[in-house]
Amino acid sequence: MIAIQGATIYTMAGGVIHGGVILVEGQFIQAVGAELAVPEEAAVVDAKGKFILPGLIDAHTHIGLEEEIYRIEGDDVNETSDPITPQLQAVDGINFMDLAFADALRGGVTRTMCMPGSANILGGQAVFLKTLAASPAEMVYRNPWGLKAALGENPKRVYGAQKKAPKTRMASASLLREAFANARGLMDKEDIKTAELYRNAAIFKVLRGEMPLLLHVHRADDILTALRIKDEFGIEMQLQHGTEAALVADELVKRDVPVALGPLFTNRAKVEMKEVAFRNAALLAERGVRFCFITDHPVIPIEHLRVCAALAVREGLEEEAALAAVTSTPARMLKLDQELGTITAGKRADLAIYSGHPLDFRSRVERVMVDGYWWGKTVE
């Protein structure tokens, strides 16, 4: 057993405990409180004066798929030979030795979603990862988790340059509808061919409500197109990026469609990102839209996830909402809130110890725990 004592603990479950104790047994949090008795056999970590948060969750990255320094060799994020590739699995392209996994831990990020890029209308299946494990195979936590799709500039730019569809937003929407309509027609067939089953299996899961469509979209008009498609096929959808989501907030709230918001700590790289701003987080919160922050690593280095939260507070977001948007909210969006996202008894022991307040840029991550295993030096 491990006992971490003396820290200010942000449980993200409705309270802050000053000078508290966290007891960890194996992979799980056994207890947390202000006045817990520490068992004699426990290995004690003195965290007096420190701050503890649940491990951060980045719900949208390309970690291991798009490496920072290996260019062609480390770029496996977009399969640009076909705009419809739902059969692809991000896990098959990940380099688990990517330096970014250590960067994630340095930033307090203990779990992350890795997904294909946005060149394709249907890009493939996402995988949810731990950033630390005893082996690369054990870093895979949920696979698959969601089917990546895209509307907007990227598919029409990539395939328009190849002189094939989609060259317009109309064609992008049409191809997405066609893929789902074809799959729906095949779903209950008894004599479906093996190749058709393999190619459409992920779409079947979305149609059956077994996993969501993770739809890359920035502009308000593209968001409305996405919502029309959601309504037509009755599927669960989560928006990725959602730069102009605040403009259509009522429509999102009506359908309970959440937004993986970001990357915000970046320039206006494309026309459809002209409204990118940290104030967008506060606007979504005011209008009741569920959202979490994402880095879209390597667009923003994954270790800067909490910097995004801090800058959103500067632009009007409440501190509690900002911290939730990198912990408990992504856990709920990923349907893993029974396991992750808060420091409560029974949850997995994902913790990060900070030298100061987590939203203070000067604070450093001193130690990280993932599933009960430590990464980093002993707290000084």
Regions found by a protein language model. Name each.
Residues A7-Y10, H18, R332, T344-E380:
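C-terminal cap of metal-dependent C-N hydrolases
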Residues I2, I9, A13-L53:
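Histidine-rich, glycine-flanked metal-binding segment
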Residues A7, I22, Q27, G49, ...:
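Divalent metal-coordination and catalytic microenvironments
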Residues K230-M237, V253-A260, G288-R290:
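Glycine-enriched alpha-helix->loop->beta-strand junction motifs that scaffold or abut catalytic
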Residues A100, L105-M237:
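Polyanionic/metal-chelating signatures
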Residues K50-P116, N120:
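Metal-associated gating/positioning segment near the N- to mid-region
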Residues E67-I94, S135, A150-V158, L207, ...:
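Active-site gating loops and adjacent loop-to-helix segments of metal-dependent hydrolytic enzymes
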